Each structure stands twice: as structure tokens, then as C-alpha cells.
């Protein structure tokens, strides 16, 4: 059984990506040459060559999630247990995850996924188990699940099964007065390497700002900088 947790940091035993992928294989006593080949194959199958030999501390949340999945995939378990594997992933990385789940399914593996995002799984899963108040309240095929009316799905606390059904309502932005936060030409760094440069941003009292972007774009580093947890800024 291989497990991927919601927070990948809680399952890491090493400080670099290759060592983390190899860790389980080492504990199985796999010969060195076979181990190296398995790590190479894993990186190729999951298309994560760009994450090879990287410090785990330098990776974004989504990149860490990819390494966590790779460390399990390398061990070739019969059963995969995934706890919200898409929680740290951007939309492109979620599509990569979907592709990897299909690959594992084609290999004849059993997969159990606890998840809030539903849309990317609808052509992957065979059964959907709905839980309510600690009990199984329903078991559906994907076709039956898609047929649930929107209002009923909302009552069940479920998200959309098709992103084309999602139509967010936006309000016209006003000129926020009384600025409480201002960034001017700020740069963010990790071990003296630039992550983001020339950030100019201001926020007014009562204003809500969403910081979005691909995995590794610097969203978390910016947030950590604003609350004083990341010191490499200029």
C-alpha cells in the first residue's frame, strides 16, 4: 500500500528529491543499479525530470506533491491511497495528476482517493462513495453522479463535476481608499536566486486580493514574506 498525504511535507524523510524518490526502494533493499534505473523510469513516466536533484525546501507546494507521488509510484504498490492529492496543484498540474492516475489504473492498480475537487476524476473513477456524518450515504457510478441535480449537489456540499458549469460572479473593483499595505519594486529570493522581481502591489482596508499563478510562481513565498517568515527580500 502506498500513501500520498494532503500535506506532502509530513511524509518526507530527505532533503532532496532524488533521495526522497529512492528512500522507499532503499528500505526494500533494492540493489543500487536497479534503484537508480527505477528512479530514472519514475521521473520519465511522471514527466518530472525538471524536479530531479532539487532541494525539497526550494520546491513549491505543488512540486512537493509531485515528488511525494513519485516516491510512492517508484515502489510499485498494488494499492494507492491518496488524500486530496490535488490540494496544492494548479490546473495544469491537476491534468498531469489525472494522466498519472490513468497510467496507474492501466497498470491494474487499485486507487482510493479522498477528494473535494471532482471534475478531473469523472473519467478516471469507477465508483464514487459519498460520506455524510461519518457514514457512507451513497455509492454512485460516474454516470449516476453526473445526473445529480445542481441544487441537490449543493445540499450535499459537493463541488461541480464540470468546470463549464462554474460561472463566478464578479463585482466591479472600486478604487480602494485608505491603503494599509504597499509593496514597491520588491524582489523575492531563495539562496540568492531570484524567484520574483519588481513586485508592485497595494491593498486597501477591507479589500480582498487573490494571489494566483502556476506552481512555483512564488505565491507562497510572497505570502511568507508579507508575514515575516521569509527573509530573503529586497
Name what the model sees in each region.
Residues 212-214:
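The feature captures the beta-strand-to-loop junction immediately N-terminal to the Walker
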Residues 80-83:
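Catalytic Walker B motif of ABC-type/P-loop ATPase nucleotide-binding domains
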Residues 33-51:
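Conserved ABC ATPase "signature" region
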Residues 69:
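Hydrophobic anchor residue at the start of the ABC signature
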Residues 135-157:
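Conserved beta-strand-loop-alpha-helix hinge in the C-terminal portion
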Residues 55-59, 63:
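Conserved ABC ATPase signature
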Amino acid at each position: 500500500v502506498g500513501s500520498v498525504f494532503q500535506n506532502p511535507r509530513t511524509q518526507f524523510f530527505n532533503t532532496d528529491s532524488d533521495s526522497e524518490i529512492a528512500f522507499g526502494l532503499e528500505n526494500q533493499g533494492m540493489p543500487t543499479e536497479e534503484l537508480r534505473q527505477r528512479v530514472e523510469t519514475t521521473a520519465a513516466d511522471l514527466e518530472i525530470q525538471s524536479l530531479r536533484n532539487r532541494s525539497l525546501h526550494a520546491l513549491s507546494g505543488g512540486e512537493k506533491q509531485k515528488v511525494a507521488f513519485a516516491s510512492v509510484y517508484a515502489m510499485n504498490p498494488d494499492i494507492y491511497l491518496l488524500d486530496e492529492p490535488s490540494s496544492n496543484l494548479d490546473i495544469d498540474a491537476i491534468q498531469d495528476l489525472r494522466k498519472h492516475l490513468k497510467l496507474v489504473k492501466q497498470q491494474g492498480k487499485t486507487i482510493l482517493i479522498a477528494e473535494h475537487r471532482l471534475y478531473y476524476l469523472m473519467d478516471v473513477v469507477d465508483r464514487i462513495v459519498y460520506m455524510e456524518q461519518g457514514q457512507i450515504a451513497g455509492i454512485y457510478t460516474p454516470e449516476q453522479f453526473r445526473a445529480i441535480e445542481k441544487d441537490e449537489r449543493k445540499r450535499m456540499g459537493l463541488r461541480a463535476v464540470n468546470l463549464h458549469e462554474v460561472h463566478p460572479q464578479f463585482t466591479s473593483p472600486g478604487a480602494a481608499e485608505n491603503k494599509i499595505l504597499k509593496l514597491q519594486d520588491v524582489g523575492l529570493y531563495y539562496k540568492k536566486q531570484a524567484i520574483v522581481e519588481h513586485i508592485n502591489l497595494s491593498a486597501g482596508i477591507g479589500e480582498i486580493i487573490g494571489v494566483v499563478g502556476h506552481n512555483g510562481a512564488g505565491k507562497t513565498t510572497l505570502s511568507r514574506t508579507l508575514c515575516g517568515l521569509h527573509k530573503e527580500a529586497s
